[in-house]
């Protein structure tokens, strides 16, 4: 049953990434991501790498609020907690990072994606 639930979470999380996509098309967000100022966290949310400016904090907060709303809806639809669903989404977002983008490693440090697979949390499905 756990494997089935995890499979459902993975499938559902794959669909959710498009949900906050409009906010993530913001040129300021794209510039921050390309500059390594923001990165994907294993908890499913966007994080600030280094010093935060008010504008960068606003962008990250806006995206994370939208992500949380999607996670809440999808978690309820899939009989999971928001945290379970968000982590599954975070694992997938980290797996999809492009070379040069930042992500949070399992130890909490920020890494820059290389051509090798990213370090993933052992709890990732």
Locate each region found by the language model.
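Bacterial N-terminal signal peptides
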Residues: 7-16
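N-terminal secretory signal peptides that target proteins for export/translocation
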Residues: 1-3
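Surface-exposed patches in mature extracellular/periplasmic domains of secreted proteins
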Residues: 59, 71-89
């Amino acid at each position: 049953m756990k494997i089935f639930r995890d499979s459902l979470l993975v499938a559902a999380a794959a669909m959710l990434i498009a949900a906050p996509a409009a906010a993530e098309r913001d040129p300021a967000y794209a510039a921050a991501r390309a500059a390594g100022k923001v990165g994907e966290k294993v908890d499913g949310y966007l994080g600030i790498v280094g010093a935060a400016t008010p504008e960068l904090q606003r962008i990250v907060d806006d995206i994370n609020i939208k992500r949380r709303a999607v996670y809440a809806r999808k978690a309820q639809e899939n009989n999971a907690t928001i945290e379970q669903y968000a982590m599954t989404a975070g694992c997938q977002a980290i797996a999809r990072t492009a070379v040069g983008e930042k992500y949070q490693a399992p130890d909490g440090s920020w890494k820059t994606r290389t051509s090798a697979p990213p370090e993933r949390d052992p709890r990732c499905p």
